[in-house]
Amino acid sequence: MSERIVPSGDVELWSDDFGDPADPALLLVMGGNLSALGWPDEFARRLADGGLHVIRYDHRDTGRSTTRDFAAHPYGFGELAADAVAVLDGWGVDRAHVVGLSMGATITQVIALDHHDRLSSLTMLLGGGLDIDFDANIERVMRGEPTLDGLPGPQQPFLDALALMNQPAEGRAAEVAKRVSKWRILSGTGVPFDDAEYARWEERAIDHAGGVLAEPYAHYSLTLPPPSRAAELREVTVPTLVIQAEHDPIAPAPHGKHLAGLIPTARLAEIPGMGHALPSSVHGPLAEVILAHTRSAA
């Protein structure tokens, strides 16, 4: 395991790796406002033990990557997709299996459209299609209105987690406890959730960010890609896997099926009991389906 700082335009991105660099590369793209440590070490090692060179990185404005005022230095999903490619360049990787979670699933769709030559395969989990306006859906759900796309909007557990995240926490212990409570809500009750495990991970995430207690927030200011870009997904030819979680409160299960329907090469898998989180109880089945996909794409 080693660390590397890679340039992407005028920002620097922190990254690290697991496994043998001689193995096929797999890039992990985390969700919004989360650093690379949103991918637990244990999960990354499980993928590496399956024969992959696993690389993860801090998005800009998270962890140890460049952090700036978003209003003064705005960016969009095009830049975030270019960041992912810059990480591949920084590790000397021409093509990689790319796995994106939540907002990372949106980024990977943009990678598939704008940088398809860098992909060996594509995996998207806990996300939705480019034609879904999640921001508008959240607003409509909060007003008690149905979504305009006919798919279920974010569920009450997500709204509960949002409310919790907006509550101030006094000191490190309170901040860690708040984060653990957030993840317990998002994980749901379908799979075991270990508070001590998540507390340990959040302690590491805070240390990784230099002891800063406040969670990053810049990605809340992002504008989603134009919904019209979803039509371009019909041209994607790379082997694609869409993974939906049975109890995802942010992108409920039909969203995965909808996303898979936008890409001719996509197949759909579902992780029973899983919510919008990565407790160790889902690492085994999740890694198994990802490894099977990358092997079939080789």
From Swiss-Prot:
| Active site location | S102, D248, H276
What Gene3D superfamilies does the entry give? Answer: alpha/beta hydrolase
Q: Name one GO biological process term.
A: antibiotic biosynthetic process
- pH dependence text: Optimum pH is 7.5.
Q: Does the keyword Methyltransferase apply?
A: no
Q: Where are the transmembrane segments?
A: none
State a single Pfam family of this protein: Abhydrolase_1
Q: Which UniProt keywords apply?
A: Antibiotic biosynthesis, Hydrolase
Known pathway: Antibiotic biosynthesis; aclacinomycin biosynthesis
Reactions catalysed, semicolon-separated, are: aclacinomycin T + H2O = 15-demethylaclacinomycin T + methanol
Molecular function via GO: aclacinomycin T methylesterase activity; triacylglycerol lipase activity
* Oligomeric and partner information: Monomer.
Question: Which PANTHER family does the UniProt record give?
Answer: AB HYDROLASE-1 DOMAIN-CONTAINING PROTEIN (PTHR43433:SF5), HYDROLASE, ALPHA/BETA FOLD FAMILY PROTEIN (PTHR43433)
Q: What does this protein do?
A: Involved in the biosynthesis of the anthracycline aclacinomycin which is an aromatic polyketide antibiotic that exhibits high cytotoxicity and is widely applied in the chemotherapy of a variety of cancers.
Recorded protein name is Aclacinomycin methylesterase RdmC
Species lineage, top-down? Bacteria, Bacillati, Actinomycetota, Actinomycetes, Kitasatosporales
Gene name of this polypeptide: rdmC
